[in-house]
Amino acid sequence: MSVEIRETPLGGSLRDFLNVVDYIYRDDPQYVRPLNMDIKETLSPKHPFFEHGEAAIFTAYRNGWCVGRCTAQIDHLHLERHGDEAGFFGFFDTIDDQEVCSELLEAASNWLSARGMKRVRGPYSLNCNGVVGCLVEGFETPPVFLNPHHRPYQGGLIESTGFSKIKDCYGWRYQVGDIPQRVRKALDDVNGMPEVSSRHADLHQVQRDIRVIMDVYNDGWSEHWGFVPLTEAELTALARELRLILIPELTLITEINGEPAAVALALPNINEMIGDLRGKLFPVGLAKLLWRLKIKGPKSGRLIILGIRKSYRNVRKYAALSLYLYAKMNEAGMATGCEWGELGWTLEDNHPVNTGIKMMGGKIYKRYRLYEREL
């Protein structure tokens, strides 16, 4: 029987869109279902992305059963910045069925083409500041917080619809512990500079400190492929969301002569705490999550931001700043009981950052692929 594609308006019922993953990943022990609340907020018309973006939501049905999902979206800030006439697809999950995949991506492509896009790229949920890529390597371990997980067949299905790889992103596994001598020297050198000071984020000033971190991030990452800075509204929403899970010791703001120059931000790996919640925080999921986070504590985390302001990046005196940040975050991980973390993602051609992670002993253990097709 043929595949039926249904479009759901923003703000409409997401029941099938949310629940289809239970069927797709029913026999995958590594899959961790994201929280329904997070996806509903992301796809709500009130989400700050939609101040500069638009999207459509698609679900696929065969014999009346939901068997796949995806979104199509346009980020007008991306278009203004890069001028590449690229629209995105995201939230891509499907059974092992080429027709289902093809019909979903065709629906997304047609929606984007009707709005003037010349190419479609993804998966992005919803843009580069969200969940990025299709997992093509590292299926044997669970995903960490805010990173994707897919079945091994899904990347091949995407390629079979005419998409090709445009970029790989690396997920690095890092074991918290002793650091190499070269990194120890970098830590000691920067610690010995009187103009350099470091502090953690203040939970009583979360809005202020998240803005500081993201300001340095926006500056330091501004020349990277596909980058789009967070807007003021997105910064405000991010600070509000992080306040609930932020561990101050896993944040770092490094100042030079009183000016924020380098930052790092790691989050507890919420996925290790929600695997049995099946996406639901209520009626008892929230209590379980808070106990596991605040009382039991995380055993792993994800370093999502590490950046240096451009004006300091090529100053010889501060060449050790990136290794200093890694070393300080390693110390923070030990102090908070974290045993390991995922660093990244990082772009495959971001050689300076990738080299620094290798120096710390990080190893690539997951690969997230971005695909593109001309329309």
Functional labels for PLM-detected ranges:
Residues 3, 148-226, 250:
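Acyltransferase donor/substrate-recognition loop-hinge adjacent to the catalytic core
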Residues 80-162, 277-360:
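Acyl-donor binding region in acyl/amide transferases
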Residues 121, 173, 253, 265, ...:
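Short beta-strand segments
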Residues 359-370:
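A structural motif corresponding to the C-terminal lobe/cap of the Radical SAM core domain
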